[in-house]
């Protein structure tokens, strides 16, 4: 499949991730910034999953702030911040999770599962240190989607992805 529908919430989370990276004077968007974006957004299925798993979102946010120190130089703002290879992997895994669940959209729940599936990034490490496992999160997503149906495809906006010459994923965020 050459394109996926990212919900408006996911697009907002990714914008917030860029803002968090800039706030911390980082010259990149990493998994920690994506997790901060998910926490800051706070109303999507991912936030509901974490809350149902008794995860204190403020504590997780504080843990990230303790782990990553602010950069020294002013970071470029906006869409110019590059995604780290781990952050790109999270997005790939999020699309894979959506595909496995046979969803035509990528919601915050898929982004959360992508973070956990990536395993090695700061975002995943902080979540795992807080006691979140991929299996528990996936089970909770399935439980919540059974009643709430997740974020609707009606709020999804197409975001195309294509491999570049080196085979890495290039995302076209609008």
Please provide the spans of the model-predicted regions.
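Histone-fold recognition with a strong bias for associated Lys/Arg-rich disordered tails
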Residues: 1-174
């Amino acid at each position: 499949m050459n394109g996926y529908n990212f919900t408006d919430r996911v697009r907002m989370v990714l914008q917030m991730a860029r803002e968090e990276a800039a706030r911390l004077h980082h010259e990149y968007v990493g998994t920690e910034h994506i997790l901060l974006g998910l926490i800051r957004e706070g109303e999507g299925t991912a936030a509901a999953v974490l809350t149902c798993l008794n995860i204190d979102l403020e504590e997780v946010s504080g843990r990230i702030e303790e782990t990553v120190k602010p950069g020294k130089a002013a970071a470029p703002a906006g869409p110019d911040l590059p995604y780290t290879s781990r952050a790109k992997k999270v997005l790939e895994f999020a699309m894979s999770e959506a595909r496995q669940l046979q969803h035509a959209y990528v919601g915050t729940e898929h982004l959360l599962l992508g973070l956990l599936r990536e395993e090695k990034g700061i975002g995943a490490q902080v979540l795992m240190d807080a006691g979140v496992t991929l299996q528990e999160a996936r089970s909770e997503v399935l439980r919540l989607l059974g009643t709430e149906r997740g974020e609707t495809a009606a709020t999804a906006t197409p975001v195309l992805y294509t491999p570049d010459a080196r085979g890495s994923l290039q995302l076209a965020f609008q």
